[in-house]
Amino acid sequence: MGLTSQLIPTLVCLLALTSTFVHGHNFNITIKEIIKTLNILTARNDTCMELTVTNIFAAPKNTTDTETFCRATTVLQQLSTHSCSNKLLGGLHRNLKTMANMTCSVNEVKKSTLRDFLERLKAIVQRKYYRH
């Protein structure tokens, strides 16, 4: 009986450490996938890159990365019905949604091209990756 009561705290600690490792590992995989996808998309030279999208980066400077990812997810969701939507944009949307883990609205009036949107998003994601 004494051995069991000593093992329980040890097992709980090991479980907590394992979940932290898995979360950090998944985060690194997700952020690397996002960067890879953004690199592929921004290298394209097709008419879809000239689509007009909401400029979420015109928001206040004190916007957190999570809020930015949430807003980017919303913009990509709005593109999902467009003929330019493809598997890469869909995958980017899914990965950003896991990073944001919340829903939000986008009300900005300013617009930018999809290329500019993706380039600025790539810079933010890369910064987050190097800080992590």
UniProtKB/Swiss-Prot annotation:
<dbReference type="GO" id="GO:0016239">
    <property type="term" value="P:positive regulation of macroautophagy"/>
</dbReference>
<dbReference type="InterPro" id="IPR001325">
    <property type="entry name" value="IL-4/IL-13"/>
</dbReference>
<feature type="disulfide bond">
    <location>
        <begin position="70"/>
        <end position="104"/>
    </location>
</feature>
<keyword id="KW-0325">Glycoprotein</keyword>
<feature type="glycosylation site" description="N-linked (GlcNAc...) asparagine">
    <location>
        <position position="45"/>
    </location>
</feature>
<dbReference type="InterPro" id="IPR009079">
    <property type="entry name" value="4_helix_cytokine-like_core"/>
</dbReference>
<comment type="function">
    <text>Participates in at least several B-cell activation processes as well as of other cell types. It is a costimulator of DNA-synthesis. It induces the expression of class II MHC molecules on resting B-cells. It enhances both secretion and cell surface expression of IgE and IgG1. It also regulates the expression of the low affinity Fc receptor for IgE (CD23) on both lymphocytes and monocytes. Positively regulates IL31RA expression in macrophages. Stimulates autophagy in dendritic cells by interfering with mTORC1 signaling and through the induction of RUFY4.</text>
</comment>
<dbReference type="GO" id="GO:0035771">
    <property type="term" value="P:interleukin-4-mediated signaling pathway"/>
</dbReference>
<dbReference type="GO" id="GO:0008083">
    <property type="term" value="F:growth factor activity"/>
</dbReference>
<keyword id="KW-1015">Disulfide bond</keyword>
<keyword id="KW-0732">Signal</keyword>
<keyword id="KW-0202">Cytokine</keyword>
<dbReference type="GO" id="GO:0005136">
    <property type="term" value="F:interleukin-4 receptor binding"/>
</dbReference>
<dbReference type="GO" id="GO:0042113">
    <property type="term" value="P:B cell activation"/>
</dbReference>
<feature type="glycosylation site" description="N-linked (GlcNAc...) asparagine">
    <location>
        <position position="62"/>
    </location>
</feature>
<feature type="glycosylation site" description="N-linked (GlcNAc...) asparagine">
    <location>
        <position position="28"/>
    </location>
</feature>
<keyword id="KW-0964">Secreted</keyword>
<feature type="signal peptide">
    <location>
        <begin position="1"/>
        <end position="24"/>
    </location>
</feature>
<feature type="disulfide bond">
    <location>
        <begin position="48"/>
        <end position="84"/>
    </location>
</feature>
<dbReference type="GO" id="GO:0005125">
    <property type="term" value="F:cytokine activity"/>
</dbReference>
<dbReference type="GO" id="GO:0006955">
    <property type="term" value="P:immune response"/>
</dbReference>
<dbReference type="GO" id="GO:0050776">
    <property type="term" value="P:regulation of immune response"/>
</dbReference>
<keyword id="KW-0339">Growth factor</keyword>
<dbReference type="InterPro" id="IPR002354">
    <property type="entry name" value="IL-4"/>
</dbReference>
<feature type="glycosylation site" description="N-linked (GlcNAc...) asparagine">
    <location>
        <position position="101"/>
    </location>
</feature>
<dbReference type="GO" id="GO:0050728">
    <property type="term" value="P:negative regulation of inflammatory response"/>
</dbReference>
<dbReference type="Pfam" id="PF00727">
    <property type="entry name" value="IL4"/>
</dbReference>
<dbReference type="GO" id="GO:0045893">
    <property type="term" value="P:positive regulation of DNA-templated transcription"/>
</dbReference>
<dbReference type="GO" id="GO:0005615">
    <property type="term" value="C:extracellular space"/>
</dbReference>
<dbReference type="InterPro" id="IPR018096">
    <property type="entry name" value="IL-4/IL-13_CS"/>
</dbReference>
<keyword id="KW-0075">B-cell activation</keyword>
<protein>
    <recommendedName>
        <fullName>Interleukin-4</fullName>
    </recommendedName>
</protein>
<comment type="similarity">
    <text>Belongs to the IL-4/IL-13 family.</text>
</comment>
